[in-house]
Regions:
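Short secondary-structure boundary segments
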Residues: 14-15, 52, 125-127, 145-146
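Short, charged, surface-exposed secondary-structure boundary motifs
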Residues: 110-113, 150-154
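Hinge/capping helix and adjacent helix->loop/strand transition within the periplasmic-binding protein
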Residues: 2-9, 15, 22-109, 158-163, ...
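Short helices/loops that flank or line small-molecule/ion binding pockets
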Residues: 1-5, 90, 94, 108-118, ...
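Conserved helix-loop-beta element of the AMP-binding
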Residues: 36, 62, 137-150, 166-167
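Paired acidic/hydrophobic, glycine-rich loop segments that form the ligand-binding mouth/hinge
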Residues: 6-13, 120-124, 140-142
């Protein structure tokens, strides 16, 4: 934010540093207006996955179990304010369910927590979770995008699986 606006300094950033952090931290070393966006390069889907011990096969069943067991299901995230944390909060709000959020310090720790059953639910990026889905270590329920994911085209979207209007990228 301190470089001259001459086009020689470019920052490749994501929504966490430029929109979410402002709502989490009382002060930031920059203002959003210090930057001029030039392109949106990607929209990364999240895959809604569950530990195999959770007796659900789709989004409708997950919502039903969550409603029958308020504050008993635990979902993990890569940290407070991360995209998968916000995906979980939106899911809770739109489905009118109560689940417990546990933030971890990154993708590795939260993936281990899901694989071990420490958390039952995770919204995960395909790059970190597809191998575990294919290895039958976790169960994929849906993708958070409005269209099917190229990484796993057989998965339905959350919106078409029981939560109309749900979209996170």
């Amino acid at each position: 934010a301190k470089s001259p606006a001459d086009g020689y300094t470019i920052l490749f950033a994501y929504s966490g540093t430029h929109s979410v952090n402002r709502s989490i931290y009382s002060s930031m070393p920059f203002q959003e207006s210090d930057f001029a966006p030039i392109i949106w390069t990607a929209a990364v889907p999240q895959i809604l996955v569950v530990h195999p011990s959770l007796p659900v096969k789709n989004v409708k069943e997950l919502i039903a179990v969550a409603k029958s067991r308020p504050n008993q299901l635990v979902y993990g995230s890569t940290g407070s304010g991360a995209i998968n944390h916000l995906a979980g909060e939106l899911f809770k709000m739109m489905s009118n369910t109560q689940m417990v959020h546990v933030p971890y310090k990154g993708g590795g720790p939260v993936s281990i927590a899901l694989l071990s059953g420490e958390v039952s639910i995770l919204f995960a990026e395909p790059a970190t979770i597809v191998q575990h889905i294919k290895g039958n270590k976790v169960r994929a329920l849906a993708v958070t995008t409005p269209k099917h994911s190229l990484a796993m085209p057989e998965l339905p979207t959350v919106a078409e699986s029981g939560l109309p209007g749900y979209e996170v990228t």
